[in-house]
Design a protein with these regions (language model features):
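Acidic/polar low-complexity flexible segments
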Residues: 146, 156, 186-231, 299
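Short, low-hydrophobicity acidic/polar segments
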Residues: 20-192, 228-244, 256, 261-268, ...
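Positively charged n-region of N-terminal signal peptides that target proteins for export
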Residues: 1-4
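Hydrophilic extracytoplasmic domains
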Residues: 268-330
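C-terminal motif of bacterial Sec signal peptides marking the signal peptidase cleavage site
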Residues: 13-16
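Sec-dependent N-terminal signal peptides
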Residues: 7-11
């Protein structure tokens, strides 16, 4: 009996020393986010946003009865930009924000959150950045994802297993891939690429009104006469499998002068011949001169020797996220 009493006393002492956190808000009143990634504006396909990544978001407030399209100039700042992260069962900010009766919220968001240090901003006009240069060391191969504007929201919404503000991210740059392989009818034993370059395009521009129907890349700057993508005197040996060079580019319409140039060596029966340089123009030869927002443009070359040494074609598709997380966050 004495042992049992001591046990009860110990338990009571433990409970008296234990701090019990009381949640003083209802889960449905918290502003949360329902996050997915869309491949591009041209498709409805979506993939889950990786829970290990974070993004930035801002919200603007209007009175009920006012719509964002008609009254956005009357909106007031509610919060942000703040970092949104996965909290175990939901997406939200460290500082909690709540839905208010008689008010609506409109949201702008971009990912990844690290872009905040590279000049991305949010205003009632949307997401923007000035003078984004894809050749700058700090920005090269970086991706910009912007969510569609979430207008006139009064509560969390359920979709794809989460509840919150619909936050659908899309790529806002353009992915340009160049694929090279040895032609089936090569006319040579081996093909070695010694140089590959592109030129006459812009690498710097301003992005405005991101997340809205009016978003665009403007003020194109820094025209590049030549960018060497690969150069090696020994050369890159081509095979039947494609060798792929991926590049992140400013969306733009190319000019008639925009080009791709390839130099290579062909080897036949131990005899080496220098081939090229061969210049192909994106508009004239590939018939593909538009690097649109959120697209993946692919230029394919099958290289050989002889009368018809290079077969080439181009294609443009939605920029589809890849990798185990379903989205490329660099």
């Amino acid at each position: 009996m004495k042992k049992r009493v001591l046990t009860y006393l110990a338990l009571a002492l433990l409970l008296s020393c234990t701090r019990i956190e009381v949640q003083d808000w209802e889960p449905q009143s918290l502003v949360a986010y329902n996050v997915v990634s869309s491949t591009a504006a041209q498709t409805k396909a979506t993939t889950a946003f990786p829970t290990t990544s974070t993004f930035m978001s801002s919200a603007y407030q209007l009175n009920s009865g006012q719509s964002w399209d008609s009254n956005y100039a009357l909106s007031t700042w509610k919060f942000g930009p703040e970092e949104v992260k996965y909290m175990g069962t939901y997406w939200s900010t460290d500082d909690k924000h709540f839905w208010e009766d008689g008010k609506t919220l409109t949201f702008f968001s971009y990912a990844p959150a690290s872009l905040s240090s590279l000049g991305l901003t949010i205003s009632e006009e949307g997401v923007s950045v000035n003078a984004w240069d894809v050749t700058d060391d700090s920005k090269k191969d970086k991706l910009i994802l912007v969510a569609d504007i979430a207008k006139d929201k009064v509560k969390n919404e359920s979709f794809a297993g989460f509840t919150g503000v619909p936050t659908h991210f899309r790529h806002k740059l353009c992915k340009v891939s160049i694929r090279l392989a040895k032609s089936t009818f090569s006319g040579a034993d081996d093909i070695y690429v010694t140089k590959l370059s592109i030129g006459s395009y812009f690498t710097k521009a301003d992005f405005k009104k991101g997340g809205t129907d009016a978003e665009s890349w403007t003020n194109l700057q820094k025209s590049v006469s030549e960018t060497v993508l690969y150069e090696d005197a020994k050369g890159k040996l081509l095979s039947d499998a494609f060798w792929v060079l991926d590049n992140v580019m400013i969306p733009q319409t190319l000019t008639a002068d925009s080009y791709l140039t390839i130099s290579y060596k062909s080897v036949k029966s131990g005899v080496t011949n220098d081939e090229g340089p061969v210049t192909l123009y994106f508009m004239r030869d590939f018939r593909s001169g538009i690097w649109a927002i959120g697209t993946h443009v692919t230029y394919t070359l099958k290289v050989g020797a002889g009368m018809f040494p290079i077969q080439f074609e181009a294609s443009a598709d939605a920029w589809i996220p890849s990798g185990t997380t379903g989205i490329e966050i660099l």
